[in-house]
Amino acid sequence: MFGFEIQPVRSRNWEIEEEEDQEVVSVEIPKPSISFVNDNYKLEFNNNNDTPFNIIVSTNGSPSIFVKGCFESNQFDEIADISYSDIKPLKTTNTNTVLNNKCTVYRHKIEKSMIFITVQYDLPSERCFGFTELVLNTFKNVSQVLVLDKILNTHYLSQNYTHPIPPFTRAIFNSLFKNDYSLTPLESSNIIENLSASFLTICQVKYIPACSILNLYESHLNIESVQSFTPIVKSIYPQLFNNSSLKQEDITSQFKLMINALNKRNDKGMYM
C-alpha cells in the first residue's frame, strides 16, 4: 500500500514563543552636542530673551553649497559646531569645506538675528528629532525656521510619477507659516522623514512658523539646482542680499568650485 512519509514539523506557535522569550536589547541613540567657539557666544545665547532668531538649516550637498557660496566668505561669524561622537570630521582644503563632514553654526555679521546651520553629514532619521530639539533649545527665542533640503532626504511618498527636470523646487510648511512668497507647494504629502519632518513637527508644537524648501537629488549636481534656492531665500529674507559685497560672478565661481569637488567625490567614491 502506497502512502506518504510523515515528516515532523515545527509549530509556528513554538517559534513565536521562542521569539518572545528572546531578550530585547535596546540601542541607545547617539545624542548631539553643541560646542561654541568661545564662552561669550554661549552666555549670549543662553541668556537671550529679547532677540528673535531666524534659523536657516541647510542639509548636505546642494543646500549647503548654496549657503556657503552666497554668504560664508565675508558675511558669517562661525559661532559653534554640532557634533556626534561617532561622526568624525574630515580634513579638506579651504575651497572644499562642503566635504568636511561637519555641522557648523554661523551668525550673519550684519543681520545678527540670522542663524545658519550647515549640516554636512547625513543624519539617520532616528537622530533628527534629537538634533532639532538641541537647536531649538539652544536658540530659545526663534521667530521662524527655513530648512533647505532635498526631496530624496525626506523619503517623500508621491502620487506624481512624472520626472521633473532640474532646477526644480517645491515647498512644504506647517500651518503657522504664511506663504506670502508665491512658493509652489509640494503635493499633499502622506509622509516625510528626517530633518524636514522633525523641524516642521517640533516647530508646530512650539508655535514656530517653519518651511522646508526641497529640490531634486542629483548624482551629478549642476549649478542650476544650487541657484534655484536664490530667488526663494531672497524673497523671504531680502535683507541678506542687500549688504552683500560679493558680485554674482564671484558667487557663481564659489558654486562651481564646490560643485566640482562634490561631483568628483561622488564619481570616484573618495574624499579630496
UniProtKB/Swiss-Prot annotation:
GO molecular function: proteasome binding
Keywords from the named record: Chaperone
UniProt keyword Chaperone, yes or no: yes
Biological-process GO terms, alphabetical: proteasome core complex assembly
Domain of life assignment: Eukaryota
GO cellular component terms attached to this protein's record: endoplasmic reticulum
Entry's family note: Belongs to the PSMG1 family.
Subunit structure comment from the entry: Forms a heterodimer with psmg2.
Its job: Chaperone protein which promotes assembly of the 20S proteasome as part of a heterodimer with psmg2.
Name assigned to this protein: Proteasome assembly chaperone 1
